[in-house]
C-alpha cells in the first residue's frame, strides 16, 4: 500500500488508508451517533470561492443576550467568518495579504477567545487567530453592540513573526499553526499557546494591550515535544513524513481551572502539559498507528506503512485533531478529540485525578438528505452554557471536512452545529 503525503488532502488519504488496513474496533457499529441541528453555507477552496476552507471554530457567549451569541471560525486563505446560532453568516473578514505578490498570503488556521482583556481602560473580549501565512497572531475585538460587524482588527502594527526570523523563513511556512488561549488566574495575564507547522515546537506568547488600543504579544518560552519514540521492543519509531518534516501539533485546548494544556500531536497522540510550558509532558493516549514503521519514497512522494507492532492506542485514529473541553462547574466534564481517521469523536475524563481516562466515543451523523454529518473533522469547540432557546444546554461546533452535497468537483467544507446536551446524554 502506497500513501502520498504531498498535501493536506493526501495526508487525509493516508489516515483513511491506514484505518482500513487495520481491524479497528471504532469502525464497528457500536458507536452512538448524534445529529446536527444546523450547518453553515459551504465554503469552497478555489478562486471562485475565495480559497476558503473551513478549519477551526470558537463560540463566543453574549452574556447580555445568550441567544445572540456568535460562532467565530477560520476559513484559511478565506479569512475569518462570523455566524449566528442559526449558522447564518453575519460577518466575513479577509486574511491580510503578504508583503508582496511573491510572498505567502495570510492564511487563518486556528482561533480561540480571551474574555475580559483590559483594552483602552475597559474589559473586552477578543478573538485570537493564528495566521499561518504571515506567521503572526491576529487579534479581533468583539463588540456585542455591532451585530452586523461585531469583530474589529486590533492587532498591533508592529507585531513580530511568531517563529520566523525573516520573510524568507515565513515563505517556508514553518509558521504559526495550532492555537489555544489561556488566562492565568493567579496573575490575570493572558496568553496564546501556538504550535509550529511541521515542527514539534509550542510557543507561549503573552498578549500585551497597548496604549493605542491595539494588542501586541511577546514570546515567554517554547517547548519541543519528541519527534522520535522508544518502543517497548527497544526500537526507535519516527512517524513517516516528507524529508525535513516533524510530527506537528494542531488541536490544543487549555483547562482554565488548573492551567493544563492538552495538545494533539497529529500522528502521535494527546499530550498533557502545564500551560506555562514547564514540567514534563505526559502522553495520555496514542493513535492506533503509533509505532507503525513507514518508508518514504521521494520519487512517488508516498509513504509505505510496514507491519503494525501493536504498540498503538485503541481509541484514536490519526490524525488526532479538534481538542475541546466540556466543562462542569464541579470540575467534572470531558476532553473531546476528533479522531479524524475514522470520523469519530473520543471523550476522556476531564479530571487529572482520574488520569484523563477514556470514557466513550460518538459520531456526528447525517440528520437528513440535506444536512449531513461531519467527516475528517479538523477543529471543534464546545460551550456548556445556555445559549437562548436554540441551545439551552450548550453547543458543540465541529468542522466538516467533506461537506455534502457540494457543487460538482469543487472541494467543499463547513461547520456543523450540534446540541451539546445530546452529546452529553450520549456520553453518559
Language model region names:
Residues 29-428:
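Sequence/structural signature of beta-propeller domains
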Residues 1-2, 252:
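Detector for methionine-enriched segments
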Residues 2-28:
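Secretory targeting and sorting signals
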Amino acid at each position: 500500500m502506497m500513501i502520498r503525503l504531498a498535501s493536506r488532502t493526501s495526508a487525509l488519504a493516508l489516515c483513511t488508508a491506514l484505518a482500513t488496513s487495520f481491524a479497528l474496533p471504532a469502525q464497528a457499529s457500536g458507536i452512538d451517533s448524534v445529529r446536527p441541528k444546523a450547518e453553515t453555507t459551504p465554503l469552497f477552496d478555489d478562486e471562485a470561492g475565495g480559497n476558503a476552507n473551513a478549519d477551526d471554530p470558537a463560540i463566543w457567549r453574549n452574556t447580555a443576550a445568550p441567544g445572540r451569541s456568535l460562532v467565530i471560525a477560520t476559513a484559511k486563505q478565506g479569512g475569518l467568518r462570523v455566524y449566528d446560532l442559526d449558522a447564518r453568516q453575519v460577518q466575513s473578514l479577509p486574511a491580510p495579504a503578504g508583503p508582496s505578490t511573491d510572498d505567502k498570503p495570510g492564511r487563518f488556521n486556528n482561533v480561540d477567545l480571551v474574555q475580559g482583556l483590559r483594552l483602552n481602560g475597559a474589559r473586552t473580549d477578543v478573538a485570537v487567530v493564528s495566521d499561518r501565512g504571515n506567521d503572526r497572531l491576529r487579534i479581533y475585538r468583539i463588540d456585542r453592540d455591532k451585530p452586523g460587524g461585531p469583530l474589529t482588527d486590533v492587532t498591533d502594527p508592529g507585531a513580530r513573526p511568531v517563529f520566523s526570523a525573516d520573510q524568507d523563513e515565513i515563505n517556508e511556512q514553518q509558521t504559526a499553526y495550532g492555537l489555544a488561549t489561556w488566562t492565568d488566574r493567579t496573575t490575570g495575564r493572558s496568553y496564546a499557546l501556538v504550535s509550529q507547522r511541521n515542527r514539534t515546537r509550542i510557543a507561549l506568547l503573552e498578549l500585551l494591550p497597548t496604549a493605542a488600543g491595539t494588542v501586541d504579544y511577546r514570546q515567554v518560552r517554547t517547548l519541543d515535544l519528541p519527534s522520535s519514540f522508544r518502543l517497548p521492543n527497544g526500537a526507535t519509531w519516527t512517524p513517516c513524513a516528507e524529508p525535513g518534516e516533524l510530527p506537528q501539533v494542531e488541536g490544543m485546548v487549555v483547562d482554565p481551572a488548573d492551567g493544563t494544556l492538552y495538545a494533539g500531536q497529529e500522528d502521535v497522540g494527546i499530550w498533557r502539559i502545564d500551560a506555562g510550558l514547564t514540567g514534563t509532558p505526559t502522553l495520555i493516549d496514542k493513535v492506533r498507528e503509533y509505532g507503525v514503521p513507514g518508508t518514504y519514497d521521494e520519487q512517488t512522494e508516498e509513504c509505505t506503512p510496514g507491519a503494525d507492532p501493536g504498540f498503538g492506542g485503541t481509541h484514536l485514529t490519526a490524525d488526532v485533531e479538534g481538542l475541546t473541553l466540556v466543562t462542569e462547574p464541579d470540575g467534572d466534564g470531558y476532553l473531546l478529540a476528533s479522531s479524524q481517521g475514522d470520523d469519530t469523536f473520543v471523550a476522556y475524563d476531564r479530571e487529572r485525578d482520574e488520569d484523563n481516562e477514556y470514557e466513550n466515543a460518538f459520531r456526528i451523523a447525517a440528520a437528513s438528505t440535506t444536512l449531513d454529518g461531519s467527516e475528517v473533522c479538523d477543529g471543534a469547540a464546545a460551550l456548556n452554557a445556555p445559549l437562548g432557546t436554540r441551545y439551552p444546554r450548550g453547543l458543540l461546533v465541529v468542522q466538516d471536512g467533506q461537506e455534502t452535497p457540494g457543487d460538482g468537483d469543487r472541494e467543499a467544507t463547513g461547520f456543523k452545529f450540534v446540541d451539546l446536551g445530546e452529546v452529553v446524554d450520549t456520553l453518559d
